[in-house]
């Protein structure tokens, strides 16, 4: 197993190329100093590609840190994107540009040489040509056009090109592809990744997008007196997806070039020039309205025409841009509407949750409501609710770090439970007439909460964090790909857990949406899914749940087989609730561990059902009211009498309200078939009364 | 007080420029990573200029260390020499060149910018022009000749030029002089500094010098079929002193250019081309013999003619090369014969002696004899003999570090004693009829050993270390400039202390030569000088001198005034010596503290006198024989009965044999007059019997 190292993999072009690399079967390691990008990009790439991407926050000038990455992963080739890239800024802070771009490249090349990694694809730029109109017959620009950058940014690019050529000249075993980009535009069609410039965008389309979404007043067109059909300058705009694919083509070219090294430049452009007005009109069409603009004076250093001659790449790399400016505008607008402020989410933050890991796969993701009263922290490990707080009061049981959750005596604190929640007698799962033996983890008698390696033990991808100011809510979407055969369950299942942290004015609430489907590529036609969350709540701000008043919507629950706690198939009436379906929890009783049912189980996806209050709990000491609402037909109410986390938590430290399906029993069971969707929605609401 | 920071100040051109800077009244700080140079260069510059030069061993890529220097010294301008400079090597290790040269320059410029230092003189190279013969009419090469280097070394130089131009373009308050050197040759006429290439020299004259001195067999002439008068290529050779002066001219130009910034390139060349054979012949003439050579094939990348057009520097900088190729050859040969192996002395090493100082002014300099038996360590502080060892046995009293020597109770251990050794009654010094009051430091009654701030407390410059394989000796020359008025003594006196560590076959010896003169610029006609060394010897490898047999050449000593231990003017006979002038030293006696006289005091410079054995000491336990030889007319023999260094040394831990003049008394005193030289020579020899 070998890896492609992508520097600047969290940047605009880098991120799109990482997606293409993964789609083409390459393993990728990303390093990025994140000065101009966000780790959220990596998270989104992981969700998009359903793959974990090893990531290291490293500045390329840090030789030793970079070397460490080469020691950890067998690197086969480097795609070197990392660079500062704003032309205007480069004239103001040239030394930052030289230090970051040239210094970084030198350091990278040294580490590569020291580790005997000699394949590199370098992100150069059409800027190296400078004003190609200074020559006769150099539009469209071929690779042999003499270079002559007119700003420090372009100088850094040509300098790095020269360094790479000198490295190759000395050691002909290097394989170096120098890719000169023209004007990349557009975004990933998924709307998950795209360009996210900090500050005022320098480029036409990102600026236009901000005008369209209402962040900028109007577009300034720098000169309409050029010698083009409409007076505005001509550029070669290339969809970032096409550009990303150009890197795959270049990389494959290097790998297929087996006999000796090479060092060669390729233009990546479409070969077709478009004027500013043409692009402006295409984007207005994508948005569906005419956007405001103003023609102002020419900008220093702008020239009439910078169109690529891409023939060398077309023929040698067998690569050609496929997408149109209209495609790019559509994708950009999709990205912009879905992420009006790019990756920036103010009320979201994360820290590493697995402090012993070199990677960031397991993080603790925290979102606070807009009113600042309610805060929830979710770990990637088990998509677990690690902490929920109302006005600073902790509402649930949990540990501070991953180690706690790995304890043998951890009673599923806060975890997502799946693939099938609760117990399956003898692990005998019957789906559409076929018996499956699923993992037994209770004295080889029952399968509990998905078995030994249930969802509570898995590392979820994500979260994709989005915020909706109008609804005063922020969502964190986690994804798990649960492969066929794991713990005996059939079929590849994609499970999404979408947490919504919502401001309710007087308090806050946490919505949990589950969605699961059998993946197309899965070899199975049906499977079983039943999901819930196993949080232990304690609203008394004290060690015990004692004093909590509880009121349930129903006093009917499934009858348990006393041998293994699985349902007998009968529904019985609780004897521990009063006539109002209420109870006051004492130090030792009443003891609840029953699956209460509120309605018939008749749907695979309950999300369109009424969202009903199924339980309320209050505590006189803290005056916190805790309401559980769900679309689900049942909920397990458990007073935590079996909790025994040595030295930390004892019995009745917290209670569970696990909105869910009926506990598995063939008579109630609804399978998940190919093409169907499993879904549910539950809210835990916390307010002071 | 402001400073010029010189990067690469220990290198060939840098070191010569530092000398010129100091000669022109500038204060200099040097940083150098010493990868291709030696700290000895700095020591020699200090001796040459009689100034301490703050030096920091820093790699320019170490931003924080460099920043620290800017915080410590108010830097006015930077002369940036530091670079790797071998064209051939640069094609083999291009990344080292980019990292060191380009990376280093970027880091330096960033630190300058951060510290608001915006004056720079940059060492560029004629190499940036590449092959100027590719154009019509570009020989001699003017500054407007298009650049186009043909190797990574030249690429690094043009890249740094571009970076500097970009920095200036953004901030017009910078003043940047870009100096393009042609072919520097020659050495400082003092023979103290010169070019010292490691490995095989790349350049014509250093190679030739090594042929002349016998380190290389013959010169290879790369092609004699060029279109020149003798068929060899033409270059513009410039004496390194002229080149150094060009930097002073450029610096002054920057400082005089007051109204705004500037960034400009200047060629530093003579304007006259010389062929390889012309230079070869000039050097043969300097050496006085025909040197062997062989014509071989042309070298890749060599071109016919690289001669400067230096008119811009001539007119704008008002600088013009003055010295000829013959001057350069003479100076190079002088440097080569005086330093056949450059700065490389294998049996010499140094460590910092003042561990708390940021500078290296006070070092501990250690030389070992060729036979490895005898080793001496001298500190710059007091040019003090800190340690002498025979076969690992310590022979003297001393401390491990500077702190010990600064103790109040340090009885002048190992120190150089001056300006006048021993006691002057009432500090009343009579020189040619004039009374001088010199520093009283013994209960305001006598001046002892030069006063409170005697030579033992001064930091000496040097050592200049040279080795003579034939004589099996290595010399360390220290210099002190003792200014008029210090401790009341009249006149600026230059004092040299030259230690020679010599292999005697069965053991080793330490020669001490003293030389002093009144400096020309001194306002005085005469002064007093009397120098000695105050080592305490102990050859018994035990805490006390007990058991040492001592035999003196004379039993006559000066009579002491019991009131203040100054001489009465009478010479008396010792009562503590036997008929052989011998004594065996016991735990408490005999007690000696007398100035024994061996001959009349009749000369200011005794160095041409007979070198006589004046004392021998042996110890039966170690079987070490210690012989003192001197040209001096007297010696103080002291059994150390006053030693009391709390917790470290007690009385009779060591004895002194201070070869010297008679203790000061007007009737014996010989003044040092202008134009005269004070001198003496003493040897301490240690051998096993």
Curated annotation (Swiss-Prot), chains A, B:
It catalyses: UDP-alpha-D-glucose = UDP-alpha-D-galactose; alpha-D-glucose = beta-D-glucose. It comes from the Eukaryota. Residues 1-345 are annotated as: Galactowaldenase. One of its GO terms (biological process) is galactose metabolic process. NAD(+) binds at residues 3-34. One of its GO terms (cellular component) is cytosol. Residues 346-689 are annotated as: Mutarotase. The active site is at residue 534. InterPro entries: Ald1_epimerase_CS, Aldose_1/G6P_1-epimerase, Gal_mutarotase_sf_dom, Galactose_mutarotase-like, GH-type_carb-bd, NAD(P)-bd_dom, NAD(P)-bd_dom_sf, UDP_G4E. Its EC number is 5.1.3.2, 5.1.3.3. It is an enzyme of class 5 (isomerase). Mutarotase converts alpha-aldose to the beta-anomer. It is active on D-glucose, L-arabinose, D-xylose, D-galactose, maltose and lactose. PANTHER family: UDP-GLUCOSE 4-EPIMERASE. This is Bifunctional protein GAL10. The lineage of its organism: Eukaryota, Fungi, Dikarya, Ascomycota, Saccharomycotina.
């Amino acid at each position: 197993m070998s890896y492609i190292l992508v520097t600047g993999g969290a940047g605009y072009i880098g991120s799109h190329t990482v997606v293409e690399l993964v789609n083409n079967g390459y393993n990728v390691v990303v390093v990025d100093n994140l000065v101009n990008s966000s780790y959220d990009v990596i998270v989104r790439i992981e969700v998009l590609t359903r793959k974990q991407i090893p990531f290291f926050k490293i500045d390329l000038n840090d030789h030793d840190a970079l070397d460490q990455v080469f020691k950890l992963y067998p690197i086969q080739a480097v795609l070197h994107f990392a660079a500062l890239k704003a032309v205007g800024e480069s004239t103001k802070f040239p030394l930052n540009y030289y230090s970051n771009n040239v210094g970084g490249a030198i350091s990278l090349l040294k580490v590569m040489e020291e580790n005997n990694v000699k394949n590199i694809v370098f992100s150069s730029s059409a800027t190296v040509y400078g004003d190609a109109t200074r020559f006769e017959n150099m539009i469209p620009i071929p690779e042999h056009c003499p270079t002559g950058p007119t700003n420090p940014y372009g100088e850094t690019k040509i300098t790095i090109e020269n360094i790479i050529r000198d490295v190759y000249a000395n050691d002909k075993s290097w394989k170096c592809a120098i890719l000169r980009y023209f004007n990349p535009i557009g975004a990933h069609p998924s709307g998950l990744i795209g360009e996210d410039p900090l500050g005022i965008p320098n480029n036409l389309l990102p600026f236009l997008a901000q005008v369209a979404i209402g962040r900028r007043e109007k577009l300034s067109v720098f000169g309409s007196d050029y010698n083009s059909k409409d007076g505005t300058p001509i550029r070669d705009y290339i969809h970032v997806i096409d550009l990303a694919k150009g890197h795959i083509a270049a990389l494959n070219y290097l790998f297929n070039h087996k006999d000796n090294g090479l060092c060669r430049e390729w233009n990546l452009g479409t070969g077709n020039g478009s004027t500013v007005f043409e692009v402006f009109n295409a984007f207005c069409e994508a948005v569906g309205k005419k956007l405001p603009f103003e023609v102002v004076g020419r900008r220093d250093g702008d020239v009439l025409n910078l169109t690529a001659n891409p023939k060398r790449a077309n023929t040698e790399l067998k690569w050609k841009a496929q997408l149109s400016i209209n495609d790019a505008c559509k994708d950009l607008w999709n990205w912009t509407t879905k992420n009006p402020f790019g990756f920036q989410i103010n009320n979201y933050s994360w820290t590493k949750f697995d402090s012993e890991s070199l990677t960031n796969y397991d993080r603790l993701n925290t979102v606070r409501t807009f009113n600042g009263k309610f805060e929830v922290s979710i770990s990637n490990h088990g998509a677990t609710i690690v902490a929920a707080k109302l006005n600073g009061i902790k509402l649930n049981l949990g540990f501070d770090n991953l180690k706690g959750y790995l304890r043998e005596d951890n009673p599923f604190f806060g975890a997502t439970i799946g693939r099938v929640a609760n117990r399956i007698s003898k692990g005998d799962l019957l789906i559409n007439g076929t018996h499956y033996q699923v993992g037994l983890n209770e004295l080889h008698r029952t399968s509990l909460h998905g078995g030994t390696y249930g969802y509570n033990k898995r590392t979820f991808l994500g979260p994709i964090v989005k915020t909706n100011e109008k609804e005063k809510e922020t969502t964190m979407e986690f994804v798990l790909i649960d492969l066929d055969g794991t713990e005996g369950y059939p079929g590849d299942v994609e499970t999404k857990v979408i947490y919504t942290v919502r401001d309710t004015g007087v308090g806050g609430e946490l919505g949990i949406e589950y969605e699961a489907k059998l993946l197309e590529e899965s070899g199975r036609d049906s499977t079983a899914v039943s999901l819930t969350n196993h949080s232990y709540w304690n609203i008394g701000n004290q060690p015990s749940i004692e004093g909590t008043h509880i009121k349930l919507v129903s006093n009917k629950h499934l009858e348990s087989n006393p041998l293994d706690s699985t349902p007998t198939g009968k529904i019985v009436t609780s004897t521990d609730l009063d006539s109002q379906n209420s109870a006051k929890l004492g130090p030792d009783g009443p003891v609840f561990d029953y699956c209460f049912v509120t309605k018939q189980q008749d749907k695979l996806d309950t999300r369109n059902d009424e969202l009903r209050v199924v339980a309320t709990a209050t505590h006189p000491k803290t005056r916190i009211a805790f309401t559980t609402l769900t679309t689900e037909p049942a909920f397990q109410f458990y007073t935590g009498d079996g909790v025994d986390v040595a030295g930390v938590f004892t019995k009745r430290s917290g209670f569970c309200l696990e909105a869910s399906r009926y506990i598995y029993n063939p008579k109630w069971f609804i399978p998940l078939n190919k093409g169907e969707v499993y879904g549910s929605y539950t809210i835990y609401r916390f307010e002071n009364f």
